[in-house]
Amino acid sequence: MPSSLLVRSFIAVSFFSFCFAVAAQPPGPGRGSGQGSADRGDRGDRGQGRFGEAMPLRTAGLEKRPGLLDTWFDRKTGKVWLVLPPVDKTGVVGSYLYEEGILTGVGSNPVGLDRGQIGDARVVTLRRVGGRLLLEEPNLRFRALSQDAAELTAVRESFATSVLWAGEIVETEPKGHEAVDFTSFLVRDAHNVTARLKQAGQGNWSFDPGRSAVDFANSLSFPENLEFESVLTYQSQEPGELIRQTAPSAEAVTLVQHQSFLRLPDIGKDGYHPRAFDPRAGSFPVEFLNYAAPLGEPIETKWISRHRLEKVDPKAERSRVKNPLVYYIDPGAPEPVRSALMEGVSWWKEAFDKAGFIDAFRVELLPPGASPMDARFNVVQWVHRSTRGWSYGGGITDPRTGEMLQGHVTLGSLRIRQDRLIFEGLAGADKTGSGAPDDPIQISLSRIRQLAAHEVGHSLGLSHNFAASTYGRASVMDYPAPQVDITPQGDLDFSHAYAKGLGAWDLFAIKWAYTEFPPGTDEKAALDAMLRDAIAHGLIFLTDQDARPPGAANPKAVLWDNGSDPVESLRHEMEVRRIGLAHFGEHNIAPGQPLALLQEVLVPLYLHHRYQLDAALKVVGGLDYSYALRGDGQPPAKPVDGDRQRAALTAVLDTMTPAALDLPDPVIALLLPRPAEYRPNIEMFHNQTNPAFDPLGAAAAAADLAVDGLLQPERAARLVDFHRRDAKLPGLEEVLAALVDRSFGGQAQETARQAELRRVVQWVVVRRLIGLADDRDASSGVRARVEGTLRALRGRLAPAAPGAHTADPTDPLDPETEQHAFLAAEITHALEHTDRDPAKHPLPPAAPPGQPIGEAPMFLPEGLSGCSWGD
């Protein structure tokens, strides 16, 4: 997600008195061409300039590159010299926007160091202190929006700053220009790669300056920005497994680091105007504490993140803009993906047009040789990893105001292949490449269009809206599940799998964030009126905090779901799953492929219902709420109706019956052991029958999705509290009783085949009940009720315990009796053991990962959304 950087001014002047100009340069054509030009950026000449005349011995043979700050490049020594203009009376050279990132990546999704990854944008000030130049980051988390110098000084002196680097000033010429060796700033671990590798469990790493250098050929100078690249090497004696899988020599990881300095944009009367954040509108904020706020107002201040769009005619309802937004697509994306990306990104043109901006948004290919790290480009990068991974959108944001200066999007290339795998499981690989509505490639291209639009939406300042799927397909900022219909003949219909274009929420969110009102308009009142109208038309907004936690409460906020009725939608997806499994066979992989690969294709089909299951789970102990503001007329929070909760509970329990979990023998017969050099991977079910496929392990993983979801401690606590306040709502006791009865009842009507599946479910239920009883984060009321359920269940199973039978003790017990004896012993051990540590409890096998099929990485640098928050 975009960073929540907080802001204050560094020197004792009003916040709005920062002096800067718009950083808007036409894109340059070349990267690595070795030729300087006005557009390209100056690569320098070897002649003598003003500084060279003052210091002929130091600059002889060096390349001078004029720009935002003049630089001299010494190819012989590998050094970069920064030439500074005269300082002011406080010693300040100037303030700039600083951005760092990595041009090249490690290529491992769990590690998280991806090609084109950027970090936070920071305001930095260059100032002279004695004989040293300090590069200092002001503490922009705290500030005073005031014209009073004393007020500003009080805030400035109350909080620490951060000096990021210091260098010796080696010589001062008579005119006041100074030089400093800037090499050590450029050749350092600015992206904190060593810490990130350690955090990812890849061992201890150190930066090796002896194998690192500034890349002169790809360091550019422009009037509004400086771009520096350095080749950096990191070393380790014990590299982790993920590095061994991706680096050619695991003990050395070499990356290209990119650092940018930008002229600060103008703000205030003739520049960018921040817009106040509203939690109902779906924009990302920057946040700060304003110590000059009146006593009757909060000091917490939030402004939205957005690009600057200025109308040529500010008074016109519709007008062209001074500087249109141009997004450049990575030409490294192959066709037909490239065209799909361009089409999906171009959908945003409609939103800006409806917000009153004519031709304000367009999409082009990145010019040949141009660097995607150049801060002048809004870019959509196509990034490869060794395994499928996240996509995310963000960019360079001015932390003082929220103005977005560059949109930067990363799209994982294996995402579309995972989509194709999903649809080959549903439709069959024989349809691949046919061009028909059920062609997995065509369906996947439809999804990649939405993914591109989604991530660019983040880079325009928009958050996820996970409620949009409940009122139509209303937003690309949701995570869209494919809509698979069922024909009257019982076949699967993919013709409406994904929507095309933006939804109603997207159009509103851009209009609210970007509309420029005519002079004299009460902006606050106008924006509030827009929100009231949107709410009246059913456009609600719920985001990550409401959707992602396993114990989340609002059934409207769900990832990868469809429809306004979670229960009915779950039943539909279970029927889609049943039809898909009934037709599953050799045709689900391409001719000539090993049949063993059907195991990977089976996983997303067998777990097809997993996200709609999450939607139904949120109905149980669910709470309907919105981001209401006082006076906006939205209703207060209310628990979900009891009948709806009970219907959802029934639908959830239906997903873990033996009939739902069983796989047909013809399918199991095709799931062959792995051939030579086809190693098991995380896309397969956990296996306890190796080398044979483990259908009982798959059943345990699928059942656990439901059981673990029901027994989340937050959901259990809500059930206790909601029932306390309204006896018509189901309580935790009712849910626990239903779970136990459905798991331990019905054996008389089952075949031996089905009974074994039920015993798998019983073990999952007992393990999860024990885990919740010992969960120290669960409330005492929850733990007491769960422990009571376990004691009652042990009593129910007790007749099967050893010693309860009068038959010959050498006679084997039947499987049901053995199971009950085993589970009773498990419960006894758990309840009576003195060290009730949940971490020591064995858990059911985890299902293979559903995500990443979107954004949300395990690790994301500040400044990116992600989309662990998503695509």
Where are these regions (language model features)?
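Bacterial N-terminal signal peptides
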Residues: 9-21
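The catalytic-center signature of Zn2+-dependent metalloproteases
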Residues: 30, 51, 365-384, 446-502
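Auxiliary tRNA-acceptor-end handling modules of aminoacyl-tRNA synthetases
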Residues: 26-333, 351, 360, 365-418, ...
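Solvent-exposed, polar/charged alpha-helical surfaces in well-ordered, non-transmembrane soluble domains
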Residues: 339-346, 350, 446, 450, ...
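Conserved catalytic/binding loops enriched for acidic/polar residues
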Residues: 471-871
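Bacterial N-terminal signal peptides that target proteins for export
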Residues: 1-11
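Sec-exported extracytoplasmic/periplasmic mature domains
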Residues: 346-357, 385, 457-458, 482, ...
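Extended catalytic-interface subdomain
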Residues: 403-407, 452, 457-460, 510
